[in-house]
């Protein structure tokens, strides 16, 4: 994995104070690339005991159209370079189909957080 990606994770951890949270053990950290016509189906991820599967996602490449995150029935407009949080173990989430040749690329960093840790924080929480 390129050092630049670990640098982005370090920045996300520092910015949102995630140092004390364990890493989500199943998906851990991942890079998602979705090309034209692809989408993420609506789903909810599993939690670990009393800890909530929480993901902080960086929108590395925003497609020409579509690829918009949907969290708990709400479309979340995330600019390229923006960060969006998903309480993946609590809320149904997906993304709309990608339109055009430009792919949707996200870096997704997974954590386990206590219930309510991020309540009141909007889904799209940082912009470039």
Where are these regions (language model features)?
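Intrinsically disordered, low-complexity segments used for protein-protein interactions
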Residues: 10, 41, 120-123
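Catalytic core of non-heme Fe(II) oxygenases with the double-stranded beta-helix
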Residues: 15-88
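Catalytic core of Fe(II)/2-oxoglutarate
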Residues: 62-128
């Amino acid at each position: 994995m390129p050092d630049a990606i670990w640098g982005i994770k370090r920045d996300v951890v520092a910015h949102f104070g995630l140092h004390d949270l364990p890493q989500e053990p199943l998906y851990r950290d991942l890079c998602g690339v979705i090309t034209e016509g692809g989408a993420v189906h609506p789903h909810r991820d599993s939690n670990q005991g009393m800890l909530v599967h929480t993901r902080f996602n960086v929108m590395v490449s925003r497609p020409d159209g579509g690829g918009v995150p949907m969290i708990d029935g709400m479309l979340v407009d995330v600019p390229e370079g923006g960060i969006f949080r998903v309480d993946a173990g609590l809320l149904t989430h997906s993304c709309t189909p990608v339109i055009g040749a430009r792919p949707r690329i996200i870096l997704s960093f997974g954590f386990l957080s206590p219930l309510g840790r991020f309540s009141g924080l909007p889904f799209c929480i940082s912009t470039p």
